[in-house]
């Protein structure tokens, strides 16, 4: 159960990080 919770948190953090990275990349491209 604890392992599942940790995996869920890591998955959300990864997904959030990728989403923020994509948004940041799009903003950088628009600035250029």
Curated annotation (Swiss-Prot):
Query: Mainly resides where?
Result: membrane
Q: A Gene Ontology biological process annotation? A: photosynthesis
Subcellular location per the Swiss-Prot or TrEMBL entry: Cellular thylakoid membrane
Residue ranges spanning the membrane: these are 6-26
One of the entry's Gene Ontology molecular-function terms is: electron transporter, transferring electrons within cytochrome b6/f complex of photosystem II activity
Task: Enumerate the UniProt keywords alphabetically.
Answer: Electron transport, Membrane, Photosynthesis, Thylakoid, Transmembrane, Transmembrane helix, Transport
Q: Which family does it belong to?
A: Belongs to the PetL family.
Q: What is the stated purpose of this protein?
A: Component of the cytochrome b6-f complex, which mediates electron transfer between photosystem II (PSII) and photosystem I (PSI), cyclic electron flow around PSI, and state transitions. PetL is important for photoautotrophic growth as well as for electron transfer efficiency and stability of the cytochrome b6-f complex.
Quaternary data: The 4 large subunits of the cytochrome b6-f complex are cytochrome b6, subunit IV (17 kDa polypeptide, PetD), cytochrome f and the Rieske protein, while the 4 small subunits are PetG, PetL, PetM and PetN. The complex functions as a dimer.
Query: This chain belongs to which protein, by name?
Result: Cytochrome b6-f complex subunit 6
| Source species of the chain | Mastigocladus laminosus
